[in-house]
Amino acid sequence: MWLARRTVAGARGLADITEMRLDPTYRRLTADTRLADGSRRVYLHHIRKSAGTSLMMSFLALGGEDPMDVWARINSRRLARTTSGPYAFASIHRKLLAEGAYLFGRAHRPAEEQPLPPDTCTVTVLRDPVARVRSYYDYLVVGDAIDSPGQVAPKERKLAADGFDAFLDRVPPPHLLTQLHTFSTRLDVTEATERIAACSVVFSTEGFARGLGDLATQLDLPLEMHRARVTGTRSEVTEGQLDRLRTMVAPEYEMLRRLAAEGIGGPELPTG
């Protein structure tokens, strides 16, 4: 059984590589791409509940379509890519993102596990750690809109099934400290700080409008504000629960303080 699964996975991987390299559409669209900053593509280190989806929508709208329609097409395809107007977009697929035939790509994958080609503008958006975890909890409680692509899994929603304290007991460290884990799977503050500092562009959820405007200027692209996956529900938490959460996410605050000391992340970057 194990060998059969590995054989199927290997065959699927080979088929993916063949399709990526033989389909001329994406290479044709991106062959001559050169953005204003000299890069050939943009890759987002996408941290959940930090406005990464909103940033993605700003790019997916460039072709003139409703960005939700573009996102739905990406999610419906095995290779998680599509085109819109003269632009190519890619998501999630490790090899596809490594190939580089897209204007904008993104994944939640840790940075150390995602190879990227040269001349890639790397972007990440950071958020106040307590606010991000609270937003993540509210998101699990409420779930996605019925027509939203990329629905959160029912198993993951169960993390928030019995209140905030139970959620803090259950949530795995990579989900609790997602910002740190994205840049260090060992959850090492120094390693994560160094990797974030190496990104081309870093800004915060709190300074999103300014960050998006600066990015649009840097790339010379007409990026406009698109809000997505904004959870309207705000769960009640006690001061004691907030204190507990602040203690649990202390490594992320330390990471943000180090970044701020180096002038990274913009003036709105929260440091605790």
Where are these regions (language model features)?
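PAPS-dependent sulfotransferase catalytic core
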Residues: 29, 106-109, 223-272
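PAPS-dependent sulfotransferase catalytic domain
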Residues: 29-30, 69, 76-125, 131-224
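Aromatic-acidic/polar surface patches that form glycan- and anion
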Residues: 37-38, 45-48, 115, 192, ...
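A residue-level signal for conserved active-site and pocket-lining positions in enzyme catalytic cores
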Residues: 51, 128, 200-203, 215, ...
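Hydrophobic residues on the short alpha-helix immediately C-terminal to a glycine-rich phosphate/catalytic loop
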Residues: 58-59, 180-181, 259
